[in-house]
Amino acid sequence: MALYEHVFLARQDVTSQQVESMIEAYKGVIESNGGKVEKTEMWGVKSLAYRIKKNRKAHFTLLNIDAPPAALAEMERQMRISEDILRFLTIRVDALEGEPSAMMQKRDRDERKDRERGRRRDDDGYVGERNEEG
């Protein structure tokens, strides 16, 4: 079977739970066609460089997939039909990475720096001073 990295962007107005249910549905498609999803990473809501289907932000998600091409084609077909998916990209790779992706490493690094500086970061990326009172 072939190895793939698949990233998809879901509309900003869907909830994180809905994104998780989409991930589970797409995992089911892959597994029912003889493949498996090795790793899933939700990168959160990020700003887009330009508007896509009238959206300025999107939920970014990465899937590392080990599946036959037919399974991937079926998953992509279902993503094309879904109105909640803005874009997706699938790349065939020689080997899947076991460690966190660069996006997750960046998030961890940013959170660590904010803790050291006494700041907090919310889901939208806003950085504000930590409130010590409560």
From Swiss-Prot:
* Region of interest (Disordered), ranges: 99-134
Q: What keyword terms does UniProt attach to this protein?
A: Ribonucleoprotein, Ribosomal protein, RNA-binding, rRNA-binding
Where is composition skewed (Basic and acidic residues) in this entry?
105-134
Record-level Gene Ontology MF annotations: small ribosomal subunit rRNA binding; structural constituent of ribosome
Gene Ontology CC annotation, any one: cytosolic small ribosomal subunit
Q: Which GO terms describe its biological process?
A: translation
Q: What does this protein do?
A: Binds together with bS18 to 16S ribosomal RNA.
Family matches, as HAMAP family: Ribosomal_bS6
Alphabetized NCBIfam families for the sequence: S6
Similarity remark: Belongs to the bacterial ribosomal protein bS6 family.
Q: What is this protein called?
A: Small ribosomal subunit protein bS6
